[in-house]
């Protein structure tokens, strides 16, 4: 049979040892989540730099020719004598309201 501990035989309760010394307890406990957050932020920055460098480069070869042709087509007047209007024509109701306001 195992022997009993001396403190248990006295009827008293043992003191639980402190996990941290008084010197260490004066300092706040560091969070473990912070280093991970900084590491993720560093990855995001590197991805942003890659995206910026890719964005600065223009299309090459045939892609450039195609985009130039599309821009030229957009700038040309419409076929069959039709004209493109930037402004939409006013509706009848809107015209009537303007007439009433001007009176």
UniProtKB/Swiss-Prot annotation:
Keywords from the UniProt entry: DNA-binding, Nucleus
One Pfam family hit: HMG14_17
Superkingdom: Eukaryota
Main location as per UniProt: nucleus
Residues spanning the signal sequence: none
Region of interest (Disordered), residue spans: 1-103
Entry function: Binds to the inner side of the nucleosomal DNA thus altering the interaction between the DNA and the histone octamer. May be involved in the process which maintains transcribable genes in a unique chromatin conformation.
Protein name, as recorded: Non-histone chromosomal protein HMG-14B
Species the sequence originates in: Gallus gallus (Chicken)
């Amino acid at each position: 049979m195992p022997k009993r501990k001396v403190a248990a035989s006295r009827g008293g309760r043992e003191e639980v040892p402190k996990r941290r010394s008084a010197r260490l307890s004066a300092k706040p406990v560091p969070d473990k989540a912070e280093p991970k957050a900084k590491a993720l932020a560093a990855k995001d920055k590197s991805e942003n730099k890659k995206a910026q460098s890719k964005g600065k480069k223009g299309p090459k070869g045939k892609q450039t020719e195609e985009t130039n042709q599309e821009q030229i087509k957009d700038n040309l007047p419409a076929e069959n004598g039709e004209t493109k209007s930037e402004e939409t024509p006013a509706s009848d109701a809107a015209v009537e309201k303007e007439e009433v306001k001007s009176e």
